[in-house]
Regions:
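Eukaryotic intrinsically disordered, low-complexity regulatory linkers and tails enriched in Ser/Thr/Pro
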Residues: 1-167
Length: 167
């Protein structure tokens, strides 16, 4: 599938590489991310007017129940409906709650960083559920700007995008 390009009001350009959301693809990807790569990612909704940039200090507990993935740090947790669930009789609510779109993305031209690499999920209403940011080659591990990009920091994003978005 060809990437989708979106141009933001802030002058950014985002290239989205969608992945299949049927079956357990999204579940498998998120279990891998939160179980194996938790120290490398930043998580939270990123919407106009609000940005939650949460990083993990220790490995979270990752569980599945009735289609919901729970990521639990002990002090706090969140749930994402990533698979079929039966928690409501309403077919419409089941459709709305479940991930309806998942896409790896690269955004260029922002005011905070020359580029950002991530994964974004939307529900059946088209509302953002979560954004997961991957290591950025323009910054060190303490978010200090590097003089020269370290392109190897995009390997996790590139590898997962290649496996899950098939390109």
């Amino acid at each position: 599938m060809a990437p989708t390009i979106e141009h933001g009001l802030d002058g950014t350009t985002t290239e989205y590489h969608d992945m299949a959301v049927a079956g357990d693809e999204v579940e498998r990807l998120l279990v891998e991310l939160f179980s194996e790569h938790w120290a490398a990612i930043t998580v939270g909704p990123l919407i106009e007017g609000a940005a939650y940039e949460i990083q993990f200090a220790s490995p979270p507990k990752v569980t599945m129940l009735d289609g919901y993935l729970t990521v639990d740090t002990g002090a706090w947790h969140f749930h994402l409906c990533v698979n079929d669930h039966r928690g409501t009789r309403s077919e419409e609510l089941r459709r709305i709650r479940r991930v309806a779109r998942a896409a790896f993305f690269k955004t260029e031209g922002g005011s905070c960083a020359p580029a950002v690499w991530g994964l974004r999920l939307w529900n059946g209403r088209g509302e953002q559920m979560v954004t997961i940011l991957f290591p950025n080659p323009h910054f060190d591990d303490n978010w200090q700007r590097l003089r020269e990009p370290r392109w190897e920091k995009t390997e996790l994003w590139q590898g997962l995008r290649g496996r899950y978005a098939h390109g």
